Amino acid sequence: MPRVKRGVTARARHKKVLKLAKGYYGARSRTYRVAKQAVTKAGQYAYRDRRQKKRQFRQLWIARINAASRQNGLSYSRFINGLKKASIEIDRKILADIAVFDKVVFATLVEKAKEALAK
C-alpha cells in the first residue's frame, strides 16, 4: 500500500474549524488549537441552550400570565384551573400574548375562569 500523506485533509479540517471560529476574539479565531476548543465549547453551549430556551420561554409566559391574572384578581394556578374547567384550551404562549397586547380580551378570559371556578 502506498503511503498516505494527510496534508490535504488536515488543511481542510483546519480551515473548517477556523471558518467556524470566525468572529471570535484573539487567538480563538486565529490559532487552530485554541479555535478547536472554542468551537467545541460553543457547540456544547448551543446544544444545552436549545433545550433551556424552551424552559425559559415557558417561565416567561407563566410570569406574564400570572402578573396579568393577578391584576384581574386571580392567581395563575386558579386562572389555569378555571380555564380548564371552562374547557377553554389556549396554550400559555398565546395567553401571554393576549395578556400583553389585548388586556380587554384577557379580562374576559379571567371572568370566564372565575365563573367556571364558582360552579
From Swiss-Prot:
<dbReference type="GO" id="GO:1990904">
    <property type="term" value="C:ribonucleoprotein complex"/>
</dbReference>
<comment type="function">
    <text>Binds directly to 23S ribosomal RNA and is necessary for the in vitro assembly process of the 50S ribosomal subunit. It is not involved in the protein synthesizing functions of that subunit.</text>
</comment>
<dbReference type="InterPro" id="IPR005813">
    <property type="entry name" value="Ribosomal_bL20"/>
</dbReference>
<keyword id="KW-0689">Ribosomal protein</keyword>
<comment type="similarity">
    <text>Belongs to the bacterial ribosomal protein bL20 family.</text>
</comment>
<dbReference type="GO" id="GO:0006412">
    <property type="term" value="P:translation"/>
</dbReference>
<dbReference type="GO" id="GO:0005840">
    <property type="term" value="C:ribosome"/>
</dbReference>
<dbReference type="GO" id="GO:0019843">
    <property type="term" value="F:rRNA binding"/>
</dbReference>
<dbReference type="GO" id="GO:0000027">
    <property type="term" value="P:ribosomal large subunit assembly"/>
</dbReference>
<keyword id="KW-0699">rRNA-binding</keyword>
<keyword id="KW-0687">Ribonucleoprotein</keyword>
<dbReference type="InterPro" id="IPR035566">
    <property type="entry name" value="Ribosomal_protein_bL20_C"/>
</dbReference>
<dbReference type="InterPro" id="IPR049946">
    <property type="entry name" value="RIBOSOMAL_L20_CS"/>
</dbReference>
<keyword id="KW-0694">RNA-binding</keyword>
<dbReference type="Pfam" id="PF00453">
    <property type="entry name" value="Ribosomal_L20"/>
</dbReference>
<dbReference type="GO" id="GO:0003735">
    <property type="term" value="F:structural constituent of ribosome"/>
</dbReference>
<protein>
    <recommendedName>
        <fullName>Large ribosomal subunit protein bL20</fullName>
    </recommendedName>
</protein>
